[in-house]
A protein has these predicted regions:
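Catalytic and substrate-binding clefts that recognize carbohydrates or anionic sugar/phosphate headgroups
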Residues: 2, 8-11, 19-247, 257-258, ...
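Generic recognition of flexible, low-complexity loop/linker segments
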Residues: 6, 167-170, 177-179, 240-242, ...
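Beta-sheet entry/capping signal
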Residues: 6, 16-18, 180-181, 187-190, ...
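An acidic- and aromatic-residue-enriched active-site/binding cleft used to recognize and process polar
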Residues: 14, 22-24, 53, 60-62, ...
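Aromatic- and carboxylate-enriched substrate-binding clefts and catalytic-loop regions
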Residues: 24, 80, 84, 94, ...
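A conserved hydrophobic secondary-structure block that centers on an alpha-helix together
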Residues: 171-172, 246, 256-306
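Catalytic core of carbohydrate-active enzymes
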Residues: 430-435, 439-440, 447-458, 468-471, ...
Length: 687
């Protein structure tokens, strides 16, 4: 039997068209944890007019925004061999009045052999449980974004499963941070407003279409178009929220490992960094500050940290902030377990689940904190508040990609909560941190749409290897193309091989990853074994030199960060953000802009050589002052270990800090000076 549904088309003033269709009980709403409309957004009325075989939707200024084709296709009917195709929905959108974004109305071989449908629902067990939406794809079209994707820059041909899960590294299809948003080389992007598990095929299943399949019988898509990639990303932030500005101290060096075990050990390390003039702002305590390692109870071990408040105050006087690891699960042996179960602060399990005993899985814990339940959220905030009141300045909101799926949550089914959980978790930690300390910040691993409002995020458990470094950079680039401004990664990778915990990191990997970290929005050393530079004596002086460079660059980083939180820019910028028309840039994932002025090409091999692509423009080698014409490749460039290819736009003005400091507390940013990259510039380290 024929079924009829209402397709809603809304137009917003900044080049955004919205399509909504609910197959059943779903209704269009702007009330969502994922949405946070900016003041720039307003709905504009649409008028409808029949023009020939099309219904045209246009705004008051006469700009066409959509065309619905109802004209019968021209036929020369000579054969009845095959049946006519089904009726289809042939709509072309013009979000900014310029770009044509057409639904994939005719993606089939012959009836009934359909590769895709423009809009459809899918039935399982007799119910409408899934929905699909498809847009046309062009043969030369490229795609990027979708979260922290550890793939090459151009995602065309990929079919992605948008389900948050522990990535277990940065060299596979799994990822901690899925974002239901992509960018196209045709200068548009699409945000699918859902937290359901979904599949996104970017001309993968069918080379003729971009197909979105949601495990929810509802479609709510915002199509954003513009003249620049940054404009499209800003439109996405106008829908889902802008990043907040991290505090000054967060842009300094963070030092960590898995893990420090006592106050004495931490004090010794911090004192040595000051004595040997390694600038550093944050010391992070990972899994070893509890009564039992990994047993997260949000309380210090009384024997190893006998006076935590005094310990934190001593570090603060010496210019260090303290960051603490924890997670959103409660262990069976935790002292809070009875309270958490009795009050259903953790979601009750419907059946017992097996554990793998690794401490790296939600299944190893008794339950997941239910952030859909306001009382549970306030209880969790209270656990953090007692730590923040002691002087802790940042909470590492680790995990959050996985939840107990066989559990009953107060406000949402687990199938919908799985992806959204990261947002609710990080929001709670961010809010209480800002309330107590005045600084809005977390150190987070998982993400979904909207999480960019609560910086910052890091890239998860990379391997301390060249492929781990390359995978991290790829993930960071796609993450920046998904609406996030701030991102970091474990320097020099999290785990080692072949022994996960105990293999030694190679000196060149440590050094090259340090250079990469210096030119990232935030730099943190972390991993399964020792990360302090004096454990790598052959390169320790070089590491110190690069750390000092980092602190010199903080005024520039602050300047670019202020720009980022008011626009669509990330700090780590794929080349396509500046050169979307340059086809080469859609295939370069080992270079990036750092802010709008630096071009960075990390070395990721032991041969100390790499090819470097200079985009159009005039470039100056930051370290030597050499001037180079862009629009070309530099082949087989030899780069000594103490150097990294970094170029600056000619005539750029880079604010730098002229004095050496131990930490950002010693900085007075009004003392910053302007480094002019003009004809007089001879190089940063050139005497």
């Amino acid at each position: 039997p024929r079924e009829e549904y209402t397709l809603i088309i809304r137009q917003y003033n900044i080049g955004i068209t919205r399509l909504f269709l609910g197959f059943g009980e779903y209704e269009l709403t702007d009330q969502s944890e994922m949405l946070q409309f900016s003041e720039r957004i307003r709905r504009v009325p649409l008028s409808v007019e029949k023009q020939g075989g099309k219904w045209i939707l246009f705004t008051q200024d006469g700009t066409k925004r959509a065309a619905i084709n109802v004209e019968e296709p021209a036929l020369d009917r000579w054969s009845e061999l095959l049946p006519d195709p089904q009726e289809t929905l042939d709509i072309t959108l013009y979000p900014d009045g310029k770009r044509e974004i057409r639904l994939a109305a005719y993606d089939h071989f012959s009836p009934p052999r359909y590769d895709g449908l423009p809009i459809a629902f899918c039935k399982r067990t007799g119910k409408k449980e899934r929905a699909t939406l498809s847009f046309e794809s062009r043969p030369d079209e490229c795609f990027a974004g979708t979260g922290e994707r550890f793939f090459k820059m151009d995602l065309s041909g990929q079919t992605l499963f948008l389900k948050n899960q522990d990535g277990q590294g940065v060299n596979n299809r799994r990822t901690y941070k899925n974002i239901p948003f992509y960018l196209s080389s045709r200068m548009y992007g699409t945000f699918y407003h859902t937290c359901a598990h979904s599949k996104l095929s970017l001309a993968g299943h069918s080379t003729r279409s971009v197909q979105f399949l949601s495990d929810q019988a509802m479609l709510d898509a915002f199509v954003i178009a513009g003249d620049a990639m940054e404009e499209i990303l800003r439109g996405y932030r106008d829908l889902t929220g802008y990043p907040s500005m991290p505090p000054l101290w967060s842009f300094g060096v963070w030092m960590s490992r898995m893990t420090y075990f006592s106050a004495d050990e931490v004090n010794e390390i911090c004192d040595r960094m000051r004595a040997e003039h390694y600038p550093c702002d944050v010391i992070h305590l990972d899994t070893g500050w509890f009564r039992t390692d990994w047993l997260c109870e949000w309380k210090f071990n009384e024997e190893r940290f006998p006076d935590p408040k005094g310990f934190i105050q001593r570090l603060k006087k010496n210019g260090y902030r303290v960051s603490l690891w924890q997670l959103p699960y409660v262990a069976e042996d935790a002292e809070q377990i009875e309270e958490a179960k009795a009050n259903e602060y953790i979601a009750p399990l419907t059946k017992q689940q097996d554990t793998d005993g690794s401490n790296f899985s939600a299944l190893d814990y008794a339950g997941t904190i239910d952030f859909t339940y306001p009382k549970a959220t306030e209880w969790y905030k209270g656990l953090l508040k007692q730590l923040l009141d002691m002087g802790v300045t940042c909470i590492k909101t680790d995990f959050g990609e996985n939840i107990h799926m066989d559990a009953v949550y107060k406000g949402m089914k687990p199938e919908l909560l799985n992806n959204l959980y990261a947002l609710l978790y990080q929001k709670a930690a961010y809010e209480i941190t800002k309330e107590v300390t005045g600084d809005g910040i977390v150190w987070a691993r998982a993400a979904w749409a909207g999480c960019q409002r609560y910086p910052l995020h890091w890239g998860g458990d990379s391997c301390s290897s060249w492929d781990g470094m390359a995978g991290s950079l790829k993930g960071g680039l796609h993450f920046g193309l998904s609406g996030f401004a701030f991102w970091s990664h474990d320097v020099p990778g999290f785990h080692t091989l072949p022994n996960f915990m105990n293999s030694i990191v190679a000196d060149d990997v440590y050094m090259r990853w340090t250079q990469f970290g210096v030119f990232t929005s935030h730099i943190r050393y972390h991993g399964t074994n020792k990360r302090e530079p004096w454990h790598y004596p052959a390169i320790a002086p070089l590491v110190k030199k690069w750390w000092k460079l980092r602190y010199s660059l903080i005024p520039y980083i602050i300047e670019q960060s202020k720009l980022a939180v008011e626009s669509g820019w990330p700090l780590l910028q794929a080349l396509i953000l500046h050169h979307p028309e340059d086809k080469l840039c859609w295939h370069i994932d080992d270079e990036y802009y750092f802010g709008n002025d630096f071009l960075v090409a990390p070395v990721m091999n032991s041969e100390n050589r790499r090819d470097i692509y200079l985009p159009e423009g005039q470039w100056v080698n930051f370290f030597t002052g050499e001037r180079l014409q862009g629009g070309r490749w530099l082949k087989e460039v030899y780069v000594p270990l103490e150097e990294m290819p970094v170029y600056v736009r000619e005539n750029a003005v880079i604010p730098i800090y002229p004095e050496e400091v131990n930490c950002t507390d010693e900085m007075d940013l009004s003392k910053s000076i302007a480094l002019r990259i003009d004809h007089n510039y001879k190089g940063f380290w050139t005497k």
